[in-house]
Amino acid sequence: MAEKILENKDPKLEAMTVDHEVSAPKPIPVDEPTLTRVARPLRHVRHIPVKSLVFHSKHGPITFSYENKIKLPISKNKLVVQVNYVGLNPVDMKIRNGYTKPIYGEAGIGREYSGVITHVGDNLTNRWNVGDDVYGIYYHPKLAIGALQSSLLIDPRVDPILMRPKNTLSPEKAAGSLFCLGTALNLLAQLKEKDQLNTESNVLINGGTSSVGMFAIQLLKRYYKVSKKLVVVTSGNGAAVLSEHFPDLKDEIIFINYLSCRGKSSKPLRRMLDTGKVVDYDDFNTLKETEDYTQGKFNVVLDFIGGYDILSHSSSLIHAKGAYITTVGDYVGNYKKDVFDSWDNPSANARKMFGSMLWSYDYSHFYFDPNIKIIPKKNDWIHECGKLLNEGVVDCVVDKVYSWKNFKEAFSYMATQRAQGKLIMKVEGF
């Protein structure tokens, strides 16, 4: 059949073309190509980037570094805190002074902070939560790490840390409280344990506007209830500063202006004991006022400035079986030269060993290491500090707050040793 059809071909049909009226297909719409940013899946993020303020030696500059990272997931016994504020302390400059050559790599700055928890280890979820406002101490002076970082990896078994009460303690004050308050609290507790401090103690404070000095004044009057007036050696405007911040205590303090006696504070102190009168001079050595003094020699001398002037006249100033405790040593503190953990001079070492026998009083150089593993468990100083701050028994006096971009200005001011209160650095988010 097919063969017959093929044999009967029609040439006209073969030459014909047929046009079909069919419309073209409708074009497919295509959106304009755009690029959009999407969040990286968390499973791909293996670390937390960290911005730090570091140095390499005391001769080199302080700079920002991006080398440090916090590995994820974190250890089950640790926390990550996003740092908002950091308190500066003289020990920061003393540690830097110990790095004479840039052979140790980067070294961090800052020993105390306030911030917000961003990561919680598995074993700590019953105590801490993401979003908790906290403050604490990050004290590792021999490990070349500091708190001036955008994020910190915290081990609560070593690093003191507390919840910050938002209504009673600002983040700025929280960042500058624990190191100096802890120093003052432990120093006075040591005197109390030795029966060298009680409500009838006559106390002399050398360096009343230092941060430790301010906390010591508050603790002596409000916590230890010392009834006698405190004799406080301070700078020309120190009396005004202390009176402004602690109006309830200004009548409980006898101020000695060391500038009016060319830094030899022992001279007006001895005159005060000899005459029974408190003579106050202004910066032009003009007599301002006189009041009676009947408290006698001192049971306790707290030195936060250093120097040998008061010690050289200790027999006429300090009671037998009294106590002289310093946080600096025989030499007047010099933030530009002093080195952390350096040896005391021979005379100071001799006083520590034989002071009670040769000079009839107890001499000690107090060092505060807030590492929780070092301090006995019965000494719950960190929570006691938190309670004192929360209840308003003590207050942190903040002198100035700097952005950490202005770190040069902050460290220059601290080097003058004229700060009257804490210097706080504001850490920007990263």
UniProtKB/Swiss-Prot annotation:
GO terms under cellular component: cytoplasm
Question: Please, which domain of life does this record's source organism belong to?
Answer: Eukaryota
Gene Ontology molecular function: oxidoreductase activity
One GO BP on record is: protein targeting to membrane
InterPro entries in the record: ADH-like_N, GroES-like_sf, Lipid_raft_assoc_Zn_ADH, NAD(P)-bd_dom_sf, PKS_ER
- Taken from the record, one Pfam family name reads ADH_zinc_N_2
> What's this chain's function?
Lipid raft-associated protein involved in the targeting of PMA1 from Golgi to the plasma membrane. May induce clustering of PMA1, which facilitates partition of PMA1 into lipid rafts after leaving the ER its and transport to the cell surface.
Misc. remarks from the entry: Present with 937 molecules/cell in log phase SD medium.
Protein name (Swiss-Prot/TrEMBL): Protein AST2
High-level lineage = Eukaryota, Fungi, Dikarya, Ascomycota, Saccharomycotina
The coding gene here is AST2
